[in-house]
From Swiss-Prot:
InterPro entries: LipoPS_assembly_LptD, LptD, LptD_C. Belongs to the LptD family. It holds the Pfam family LptD. The gene is lptD. This is LPS-assembly protein LptD.
Length: 785
């Protein structure tokens, strides 16, 4: 028989004299009643238990045997109190140190009325409720423990529960981290197990006792099923000062993605003062979009949009910026960028990358230093690739179409790269017995240019190599033939014609490895000695000046280039060679921690015959030297030196010293010298002598200074100056700095950055701050991570 039950076990002299619970009656229950008041027999039995109970015991006496209550079951309500009375199965009145529990819900109060039939609780004059990791205190409570619904007055709360996974994260995404939300209000409505509505609320994610910032709103809805909070008629207040108003503002209750407005961006400088307010649309776990209106005082209103998608077999991104009419030029200005990659399976894949802006000055007017430096030729390409595999080898076939938008101001024909319309490549390798392997590089390309000669070019480069690798050294000879065929179009009165070039190429790479234990700076080290020889023979006696230059340039000489067959990039020029490279490397490795304390290297190439592709030949290359290492865990030194022995002059050198004892503590100084270097993106060349000092360093409790000074001794002026500070309060962080940098010999840009980052909500300010600081200060660390 199912019924409501009352059971009391009374202890004489104890603080708490009763316990009340409702449940299905167990078989050994002594007392069970239907909905009626306690009759005289029940009261007599209860009194008899109380009168016959022994007196309270001293500490050394055995405790009495009490009649135990049935174990708590799911869905069971248990009430503890100093004093209880009521009507069986109808209402229970509890007073004094009241504690009521049901599953994960717990209510503590001065008094409590429990209505059994409705599973409803009324409590006051103070209450404290905990459920699901949340804690709410207040004055009065009216609450249904079955439906998790009700109302509390004058609430003070701390919400720290996990997301209830109603919205699944994207595949492979890390679990969402909870955000501890503290606050108060005039009233809280409990709207289910995972939902709240707070009226007259103030909320913050700062630690207890810290109210540096809070969100004040007329009403806030917290939904832990979706992990999203929504504030209505909301003011963001920072140290009591309103800094942002929104009639509707949503925010994350964990680290999951969500739809809603992101923090606004403020920036000012040579490009004008700008305000932007992004809206993030979490369309699905694998689709999202960001729509950003920009209000630019100097140029006008711009709209930007980004759409991203991700599927198991493909992914991509589309981005645009649209300015219908520039206030300065009166013209429409825009930027487009799109990328897509797709795997069709069975080795077949596809990709594309497309970029376009309305004019050559677009990034100068709207971009930052990073955008200006990296966008001279905007890439537009699409490719289809097929990967093959077979026993002992593999290969791939790629079909590509590629051209560029060149942003050089007043370009000459040589500034504009050739388009590849199209390019077909096939590369393969096959392992052979006894360490041999066969290799093939092939390339068929149609080159197209608006003002230079067009042509088709075929390159075939088969080769055979042998790898002999041991712990003490290696030997890797290689023999191949490079065949190049050109079909040149008619150009400037010259008829179309064919040119070919066939060159055998032989190379051998060999090295030895020696090591021994030694003492260095008073510590045990492993010292290595690593000599290396690289020989190349290309019997090229042909003058190649009649051949076009489609995708070829002279590589800068460095240690990596010393060990290549060709000093040119691309296939239009192949140097004649009978040359040998010698190099020696020595390292000191700390045996206690594995740090490379010191690394020394020297290398030089010797030419045994003249190269017909060079107008001036030398008996040897420049001498290359390098030194570096972790002097300690905090100190790092790197340097390189290039010396022209024929001229008796230094070509270039670079030295850098960096001190990094801890995160947020970094200082570096670098000196660069070049006799003839590219100075900017406009292909201006000349001598370079620059010193570059950068640092991020704590200057007081919670305060960090950050700066960079890059000075040119040739131009006698700074190339870049950056100075500012950062403040980390724990609950919020602030970054403010100014930057001035040169974009070309006649143009200098200024920028001022501001970013206020609120714990748990994100950053208020310029979204490019982190990229700028990491570029300016090597080793920069975000102080609130």
């Amino acid at each position: 028989m199912s019924c409501s039950c009352l059971c009391m076990s009374l202890y004489r002299g104890a603080d708490r004299i009763g316990r009340f619970y409702t449940a299905h009656c167990p078989q050994d229950m002594a007392l069970c009643m239907h909905r009626q008041k306690l009759n005289p027999l029940a009261l007599a039995l209860a009194a008899a238990f109380a009168l016959n109970a022994p007196a309270a015991l001293a500490d050394d006496e055995e405790p009495p045997i009490a009649v135990p209550a049935p174990p708590k079951e799911p869905g069971q309500t248990v009430v503890h109190a100093d004093d209880m009375d009521g009507e069986m199965s109808v209402i229970l009145h509890a007073k004094g140190n009241v504690v009521a529990t049901r599953d994960d819900q717990r209510v503590e109060s001065d008094w409590l009325d429990y209505y059994q039939t409705k599973n409803r609780v009324k409590a006051g004059d103070r209450f404290r409720m905990t459920r699901g990791g949340d804690v709410i205190t207040g004055t009065t409570l009216d609450y249904n423990v079955d439906t998790y619904s009700g109302t509390g007055m004058d609430p003070v709360f701390s919400m720290a529960r996990q997301n209830q996974t109603a919205v699944k994260p994207a595949p492979g995404a890390p679990p969402a981290k909870p955000v501890t939300l503290r606050g108060d209000g005039s009233q809280v409505d409990f709207q289910g197990q995972n939902q709240y509505r707070v009226y007259g609320s103030r909320m913050t994610t700062c630690d207890p006792g810290d109210e540096a910032w809070y969100l004040k709103s007329s009403r806030t809805d917290l939904d832990y099923n979706t992990g999203v909070g929504v504030a209505h008629n909301a003011w963001m207040q920072f140290y009591g000062v309103p800094i942002l108003y929104s009639p509707w503002l949503d925010f994350p209750l964990n680290s999951n993605r969500k739809s809603g407005f992101l923090m606004p961006t403020f920036k000012t400088g040579s490009s004008g003062t700008e305000f932007s307010l992004p809206y993030y649309w979490n369309i699905a776990p694998n689709y999202d979009a960001t729509i950003t209106p920009h209000i630019n005082v100097k140029h006008g209103n711009m709209l930007a949009g980004e759409f991203r998608y991700l599927q198991p077999d493909y992914s991509g991104r589309i981005y645009t910026e649209q300015l219908p009419k520039d206030k300065l030029t009166g013209e429409s200005r825009y930027a487009w960028s799109a990328s897509h990659s797709q795997n069709f399976g069975h080795g077949l894949s596809f990709g594309m990358d497309f970029n376009q802006v309305s004019d050559n000055n677009y990034f100068t007017d709207f971009g930052d230093q990073v955008a200006i430096a990296s966008n001279v030729n905007l890439n537009r390409e699409a490719w289809l690739n097929y990967a093959l595999g077979w026993q002992g080898g593999g290969g791939n076939v790629t079909l590509r179409a590629q051209r560029y938008q060149n942003l050089t101001i007043n370009p000459v024909p040589g500034d504009i790269p050739y388009a590849k319309m199209p390019q077909l490549t096939f590369n393969a390798n096959q392992s052979l017995p006894s360490g041999f392997s066969a290799n093939l590089i092939s390339d068929l390309t149609r080159f197209d240019h608006p003002s230079l000669q067009n042509a088709e070019r075929l390159v075939l480069y088969p080769s055979v190599s042998w790898n002999f690798d041991r712990s003490w050294g290696f030997l890797r000879p290689k023999l191949g033939v490079n065949y190049t065929h050109y079909n040149l179009d008619a150009f400037q009165g010259s008829p179309s014609h064919v040119q070919t070039r066939t060159l055998p190429i032989f190379s051998t790479d060999a090295g030895l490895y020696f090591d021994r234990d030694t003492q260095f700076l008073g510590r045990d080290h492993l010292m290595t000695l690593e000599p290396r020889l690289f020989y190349v023979n290309i019997p090229n006696n042909r003058d190649q000046n009649s051949l076009p230059m489609f995708d070829t340039s002279v590589n800068d000489i460095n240690f990596a280039q010393l060990f290549t067959e060709n000093r040119y990039s691309g296939y239009d020029r192949i140097n004649g060679a009978n040359q040998i490279t010698t190099a020696l490397t020595s390292r000191f490795i700390d045996q206690s921690n594995g740090l490379e304390r010191l690394r020394l290297a020297v290398g030089k190439r010797f030419y045994l015959k003249d190269d017909v592709t060079q107008t001036v030949n030398q008996p040897s290359s420049d001498l290359l030297l390098s030194a570096g290492g972790d002097l300690t865990r905090e100190w790092r030194f790197d340097s390189s030196y290039q010396y022209n022995q024929q001229l008796g002059m230094t070509e270039r050198y670079n030295a850098q010293l960096r001190y990094n004892p801890a995160a947020g503590k970094i200082a570096s100084v670098r000196y660069r010298f070049g006799r003839y270097e590219q100075l900017d993106n406009s292909n201006n060349y000349g001598p370079m002598r620059q010193v570059d000092v950068a640092a991020q360093w704590p200057i007081a409790r919670r305060w960090y200074a950050i700066g960079r000074y890059n000075y040119s001794f040739i131009e006698r002026k700074p190339i870049e100056r950056l100075a500012g500070f950062e403040y980390n309060d724990g609950c919020w962080s602030l970054r403010m700095y100014s930057q001035r940098y040169v974009t070309d010999p006649t143009t200098t840009k200024n920028a001022w950055f501001f970013q206020l980052e609120l714990k748990g909500l994100g950053a208020l300010g310029n979204n490019g701050v982190q990229d700028t600081l990491r570029l300016a200060v090597p080793g920069y660390t975000k102080i609130n991570e």
